[in-house]
Design a protein with these regions (language model features):
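Short glycine-rich, Thr/Ser-proximal phosphate-binding strand/loop in the N-terminal lobe
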Residues: 2-49, 80-82
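Short glycine-aspartate micro-motif
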Residues: 5-11, 66-68, 132-137
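Conserved A3 ("GATE") glycine/threonine-rich loop of ANL adenylate-forming enzymes
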Residues: 15-16, 113-115, 140-142
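Short beta-strand scaffold segments in enzyme catalytic cores
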Residues: 17-21, 73, 142-143
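Glycine-rich phosphate-binding loop and adjoining helix at the ATP-binding site
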Residues: 32, 41-52, 56, 65-67, ...
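Conserved Radical SAM active-site core
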Residues: 59
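Phosphate- and other anionic-substrate recognition elements at nucleic-acid/protein interfaces
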Residues: 62
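A gly/ser-rich beta-alpha-beta helix-loop segment of oxidoreductase catalytic cores
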Residues: 125, 138-140
């Protein structure tokens, strides 16, 4: 029988891969986040191994709940089309399929800045705002 749990959010960054269970009603982390240094080189397989570590760390809380993964890249339908702060071997990688195979869970992969914008509209200062909303991200890279 499937074990329900809290969805897990994972952000793949240039210097660290961070993850935590997420309370989708409040738009907040449900537990303190875990950060693991981004492997060098940050190939798809190496990053998938770190994602596995994060999934294992939060297994009790997340059960078999879906995982959302953000990456610093252009992503269309789960496929990475560029590579900023990650290895160029990501280009044309079906990241959703790769991570679903590694974790055994439903995985959705999107661009990190896109995810931040959507979260801001649903939970943050842009909630209920009509018109254009601009979000700038600053990290190892600028989005």
């Amino acid at each position: 029988m499937a074990k329900k749990g809290t969805p897990l959010g994972i952000d793949v960054g240039g210097s660290g891969i961070k993850g935590a269970p997420v309370n989708l009603k409040r738009g907040e982390l449900a537990s303190p986040r875990l950060k693991i240094l981004t492997p060098s080189p940050a190939t798809p397989e190496a990053v998938a191994d770190v994602v596995d570590q994060i999934v294992d760390h939060f297994a009790k809380e997340t059960g078999d709940a879906p995982i959302g993964v953000t990456v610093p890249a252009v992503v269309i339908h789960g496929t990475v089309l560029s590579a900023a702060n990650i290895d160029p071997s990501w280009i044309e990688t079906d990241a959703e399929s790769l991570l679903q195979e590694h974790t055994g869970r439903k995985v959705t992969v999107v661009n990190d800045a896109d995810a931040a914008g959507v979260a801001e509209v649903h939970y943050g200062a842009a909630k209920g705002v009509k018109g254009l909303v601009i979000l700038t991200t600053l990290g190892t890279g600028i989005g």
